[in-house]
Amino acid sequence: MNESSNLVLSARGLTKRFHEGRIDLTVLRAVDLDVHAGDTISIVGASGSGKSTLLHLLGGLDAPTQGTVLLFGQDISALSPAAQGQLRNKYLGFVYQFHHLLPELSALDNVAMPLWIRRQPREAAQRSAAAMLEQVGL
């Protein structure tokens, strides 16, 4: 068990409800989750079970109906959208289950693209991407 000083991400009581007309659907109910530095976690469930919704809440891409998400001790819902984006870009990354390479880009540019999105200069991103490709033998 890791110490609380290594706590990276913490969620308490996360609940998400969607309202559409007369439909009131609770997708997540009172989810608690702690992720410490070095932890590896998997979120597994059937299609439509709320996995993507949970990840969106944890990353501040959507707001919970109830509950809190702390990233390095900061309540992300209390931050401005710009501050949320900065925190997300610094500490989080998203890989969706239907990811794909962009055929119009080289392998190097496909690897560098997330760094460009995080506003890393093109040359620095390509150097980092080349180093990553070399580490995995590509």
Region annotations inferred by a language model:
Residues 4-8, 17-30:
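A short, flexible loop at the N-terminus of ABC-type nucleotide-binding domains that lies
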